[in-house]
């Protein structure tokens, strides 16, 4: 461990001990000063977060920090958790929990292994899931498999978001934010009472900015924001036993995409080729687009503070959603709950896939998605048994068109297809070509502009039944058992034509369609023991199983790839041992846990050369088993009435078992070798966050000074651990200072104050590489008022 790390850890330890000692003194002076208790629904019923025997970080008061703009700003508050925005998708998220992350975040044909739930509704698409912080009551981050109660696609964990309920009293909260790059944000929530039995809440948000990375090719900026949302929530309480909570909302996000910004290819001689060895593709000699368009090559290997796209990254995601939650208390011991959710999402986007100033590859995507879910649940509480049992139904469907244009196809096939008789042969699809040419085009176009057209639609239906019970064996020992049965069916239809006219949805007369269907079922169990050491501390141990859906991947190069890319479910088995305690008169909250997660049939995606078409394609398979082992610490400290702090730390050791693949995709030879020496993606060995708030009385109000430092260790983003695709170790510092008085406040905030920027490079092996940089230092001011 480096000297810097030793000093850092020593400082943290000393700070902790000092805080505890100070707490002993201050506790006598202010015995009522305690850490806020947060009530969560991590086990489908209300409990104190400290009583839940799982690794959970619950946030409520922290959400008031002006440095938390959306859920991506939560990174650093929970160990082994990284939440980022998906720059290639409007409002998309990229979440890592304990090294588990979605192998693909840009397409609806793949389900994330981490669930985002909003008011009890599972979001089945990443588009629009980058949730705004305003009007949230709390966020619960559940780490590790949650298959028994939350079901499929939770092998990594769950981000559980709960918004505020109508108060039934007239009042309002308004907020305005102004920042760099023309940032203007306006938010409002109004509560009122419509009658003695109906309370209502109305909410609206508007976010706009001019973007933050200049595009030197076509002008303007990438990352421009234009987001509006509004809706209403109604609470109906006709009597003491029944309530119905209905939310109707719409969101319109016209923000531009942030990725990709640059082509990583550099002119020959600018950087040396990589050393000999597998999986180190040479991007230094002008591969493909750099060789064809030398003016678009980077002249420096250094990170560039601008974008070079020849296409404006326009995007749109429009969402309409309805959520209904009804609850009926049958008696003092039994409660029946019904939750229904429906979402319609329309998503469009266009982006420069080669990331350069050349008109080489431009991708356009149109997607319509809808989902409906129903859940009915019975919760019971008797003398020594508490249980939850329910039925769940989920259905989603998407339809997608995709067009890849630019000069790429002309460069690849133009010389052959422009020869006499060859266009007609390609149209006939008689075996001389691996692709078919558009029969509606009479001849090879003079400008050489061709399009690859893809179509895919998929319907998913799943049903589940579950039950979990806590049995108090003694006054201190609790036995937890749970089981969930799931059945899921997917029906996928896809077609693809390489060389076509740019006419999306115009008949879709493909030479071949893939019509694929499969059904899977799974039974997952949970067994756990919890022992109360005293009223304020517990130890627990649990064994939990999880299930991640199988399926078909739509982003491929031809219909044969669609058939080839059928992948099976992956399964997880997790052991967790933990300790939770409130110490020093509830001034210190200390949670620690060890975990061991075994994954079977782990799903992975790689970008390889298609041997039939000589272009790149996405290949999916269940590559191997994988093991994730680590330790987590999560602490909060109330030093005194003026200062509170938090600290979290996570370690992770991730390894493959039985991974066999072609470890050198660039040599043109398929050679399968043992690859257990590679590191699974998105698994930093170490991460931590530390921060605090100092409250200083000032006049009639209070000045709050907040700061947070977080560090994420380096991790692999490429399946074959390419040096080019390795994300570096990153530090992040956020801070704010604000004045709060009665019902108003003014806060100045700064994010990424050290201005640490890095480039994440995506190798499209063996053709080229594209890069995206993160946003640098930025400042803003937030004005808030309540009445």
Label for each model-derived stretch:
Residues 235-239, 378, 390-394, 456-597, ...:
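Structural signature of Gram-negative outer-membrane beta-barrels, strongest in the C-terminal barrel
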Residues 33-169, 577:
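Acidic, small-polar-rich N-terminal luminal/periplasmic segments of exported/outer-membrane proteins
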